[in-house]
């Protein structure tokens, strides 16, 4: 059993034996359209490490999308989405894609598609990043187009390419 608090709300969560095929992708960016990418510790199944935005699955079926986004950003980067100068926004975009074969064993039998909800997190340029060493080995800030080009997952690149529409929002 896990007790978690995000955004002033407490929740008791019972860990599930399998990952839930519902996840978030959070594009973290500055007002100058610099995008944060993190490098995964484990490779793509062929041994190659890859770059991505913050991602993560729901811990329980009814977990609200915003809570998942806040939890994953904090776990992976140490950034508090409710901190000074930060603005978390649900971009109301969803990607549905096949789960990569090398990761199917993490999901319940029969699960083959993942639904990914896209969020943006605007942060101040001085934000401090503290990586979780179990998940990531490096981070880097890139201009948004360059960041999109560096992403392993096509859905991640596509999400970053939507950034200009949200910069003025």
Language model regions located:
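NUDIX/MutT-family hydrolases
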Residues: 117-123, 128-160
């Amino acid at each position: 059993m896990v007790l978690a608090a995000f955004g002033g709300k407490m929740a008791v969560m019972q860990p599930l034996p399998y990952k839930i095929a519902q996840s978030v992708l959070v594009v973290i960016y500055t007002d100058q359209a610099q995008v944060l990418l993190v490098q995964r510790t484990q490779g793509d199944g062929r041994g190659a490490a890859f770059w991505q935005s913050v991602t993560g699955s729901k811990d329980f079926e009814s977990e609200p999308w915003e809570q998942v986004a806040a939890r994953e950003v904090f776990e992976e980067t140490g950034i508090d989405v409710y901190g000074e100068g930060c603005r978390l926004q649900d971009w109301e975009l969803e990607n549905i894609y096949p789960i990569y074969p090398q990761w199917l064993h993490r999901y319940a039998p029969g699960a083959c598609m993942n639904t990914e909800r896209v969020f943006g997190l605007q942060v101040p340029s001085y934000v401090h990043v503290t990586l979780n060493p179990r998940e990531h080995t490096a981070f880097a800030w890139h201009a948004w187009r360059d960041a999109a080009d560096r992403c392993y997952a096509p859905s991640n690149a596509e999400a970053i390419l939507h950034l200009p529409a949200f910069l003025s929002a």
